[in-house]
């Protein structure tokens, strides 16, 4: 029996559970894209699937709305896939294991994908209904939002006529997003030179950090949580100061827009220095625990000996350059907004640290609501990377979404909210990328607001979606569509 079958609105939770049963990690969205196409064809709706996998579905206006401006319902089909160490799952072949606990839906030790599966579920439920009044609809579901909004960047809009865009990719009920930061993905490629291990009595050691809370690198960067990659870079530098080490393996984080929760390094050291290494880690553990006692109270550094023999190591120059890059590259909040003191204006997150055969890649999500500051951060990364012998690349650049002084859609949504709930919604500009900016750049007269039901800890295995908030947001959405004549 379906886990969510008894929940209202039934159509929304039915489609959400179906979506959760289809693998749809970023860069692995063909199955979910084809599912959306089949859905539309079964209902004789116009559908276009582009080469990227983006899907556009159109539904005619209901009676009385034939002359109303066209409305776009927009979200993304991909999700961030994260799990705890003890969870066995193949995100490429298996669906999620949903859990319903009272008012909360979550997945068993994995991310839930409410970001942004709930938007897709809303859209499908509206497309499938025959009793919901609405203007002509253009449902636009994009791919690869979570890895740089690549689908929205690549989509063509010549066949779209929407005047209003409802973006269902926000996680705070009662908040209407009316602007966002721009951003890019920046990568520092540090070369590796391998050599035979020439230490007299080498001992292999593994250093790791875990117990961090992580989170979304835009929405939660303001919480100043520890970054596993930066923390281990700092730890390696402390070890390097105490002993002669050679790096063997380095790994931490796979998503530039998720603050990394854990990371590991493998290195070799002379046997006589292993106790010195352990003492250096123990000393730094006390320091880091004190620094992050509020934001990451369970941060833990671990050092242990490896059992396998090591034949090749990074030479001193390439290993030292990698450690220096991890220590020196900027990370976290760089500037708060002068106009809105509670808003992060500029930040970056070292979310990806992965080793290829001949290089280590350090991937950043760079964000700013001021384009020149975003470009300056990119320049800093490039300059330092190249100074240390690496190469720099960037991709996924997207524009900021600037606040509009006049917005009919915003006015309607505020009025509906006040009538339904007796209070004013919070109008906000956020330090995170949403696809609105890209669509508004392509469709100059588009009027857009982003909103959604209450979710917590997105992009982590603790992600939770609140049932009653979904119900209220559904009611809110239907009333908005009813008013947009």
State where each predicted segment sits:
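Midchain, well-structured core segments that form catalytic/ion-binding scaffolds
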Residues: 96, 101-106, 110, 146-147, ...
């Amino acid at each position: 029996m379906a886990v969510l079958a008894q929940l209202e609105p039934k159509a929304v939770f039915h489609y959400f559970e179906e979506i959760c049963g289809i693998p749809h990690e970023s860069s692995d969205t063909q199955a979910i894209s084809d599912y959306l196409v089949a859905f539309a064809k079964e209902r004789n709706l116009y559908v276009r699937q582009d080469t990227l996998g983006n899907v556009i579905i159109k539904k005619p206006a209901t009676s009385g709305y034939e002359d109303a401006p066209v409305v776009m319902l927009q979200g993304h089909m991909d999700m961030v896939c994260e799990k705890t160490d003890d969870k066995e799952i193949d995100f490429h072949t298996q669906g999620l294991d949903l859990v319903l606990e009272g008012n909360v839906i979550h997945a068993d030790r994995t991310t839930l994908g409410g970001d942004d599966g709930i938007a897709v579920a809303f859209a499908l439920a509206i497309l499938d209904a025959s009793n919901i009044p609405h203007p002509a609809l253009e449902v636009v579901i994009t791919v690869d939002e979570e890895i740089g909004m690549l689908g929205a960047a690549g989509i063509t809009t010549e066949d779209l006529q929407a005047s209003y865009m409802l973006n269902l990719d926000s996680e705070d009920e009662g908040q209407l997003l009316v602007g966002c930061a721009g951003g890019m993905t920046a990568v520092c490629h540090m070369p590796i030179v391998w050599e035979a291990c020439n230490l007299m009595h080498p001992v292999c050691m593994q250093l790791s950090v875990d117990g961090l809370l992580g989170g979304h690198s835009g929405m939660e960067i303001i919480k100043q949580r520890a970054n596993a990659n930066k923390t281990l870079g700092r730890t390696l530098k402390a070890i390097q100061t105490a002993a002669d080490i050679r790096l063997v393996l380095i790994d931490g984080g796979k998503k530039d827009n998720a603050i990394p929760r854990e990371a590991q390094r493998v290195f070799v050291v002379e046997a006589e220095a292993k106790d010195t290494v352990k003492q250096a880690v123990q000393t730094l553990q006390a320091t880091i625990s004190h620094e992050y006692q509020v934001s990451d109270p369970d941060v833990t550094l671990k050092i242990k000996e490896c059992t396998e023999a090591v034949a090749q190591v990074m030479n001193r120059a390439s290993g030292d350059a990698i450690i220096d890059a991890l220590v020196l590259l900027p990370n976290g909040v760089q500037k708060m907004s002068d106009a809105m003191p509670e808003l992060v204006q500029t930040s970056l997150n070292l979310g990806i640290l992965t080793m290829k055969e001949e290089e280590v890649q350090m991937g950043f999500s760079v964000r700013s609501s001021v384009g020149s500051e975003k470009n300056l951060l990119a320049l800093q990364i490039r300059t330092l990377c190249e100074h240390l012998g690496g190469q720099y690349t960037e991709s996924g650049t997207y524009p900021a979404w600037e606040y509009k002084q006049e917005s009919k859609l915003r006015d309607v949504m505020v009025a509906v909210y006040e009538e339904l709930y007796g209070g004013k919604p919070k109008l906000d500009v956020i330090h995170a990328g949403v696809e609105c900016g890209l669509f508004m750049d392509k469709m100059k007269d588009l009027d857009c607001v982003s909103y959604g039901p209450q979710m917590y800890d997105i992009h982590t295995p603790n992600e939770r979606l609140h049932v009653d908030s979904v119900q209220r947001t559904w009611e809110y959405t239907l009333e908005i569509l009813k008013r947009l004549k």
